[in-house]
């Protein structure tokens, strides 16, 4: 199973997040997910906010076009991004 699906202008990502890291960055693949380290603690939604802002920046879309579909309180998350023509594979190349 691939860590992302892409159709028209929608990208769906399967993520494994690691909150409380030194900096927010892509850390490679983790099974069938993209691993993302987050420089925010997993309290009061701070890690989710950090993730949404990072994805908004990485995919060059407004924050309102990034939505958390599942995994609000889990390390495994599914996120949908609309309106980006960026290839998700580019996240792995830095």
Describe the residue ranges of each PLM region.
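Contiguous, often N-terminal, cationic amphipathic patches that form binding interfaces
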Residues: 1-45, 49-52, 61-63, 67-72, ...
């Amino acid at each position: 199973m691939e860590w992302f699906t892409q159709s028209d202008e929608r990208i769906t990502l399967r993520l494994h997040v690691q909150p409380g890291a030194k900096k927010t960055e892509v850390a490679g693949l983790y099974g069938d997910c993209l691993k993302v380290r987050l420089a925010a603690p997993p309290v009061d939604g701070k890690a989710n906010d950090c993730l949404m802002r990072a994805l908004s920046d990485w995919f060059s879309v407004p924050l309102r076009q990034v939505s958390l579909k599942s995994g609000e309180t889990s390390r495994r998350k599914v996120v949908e991004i609309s309106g980006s023509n960026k290839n998700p594979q580019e996240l792995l190349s830095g």
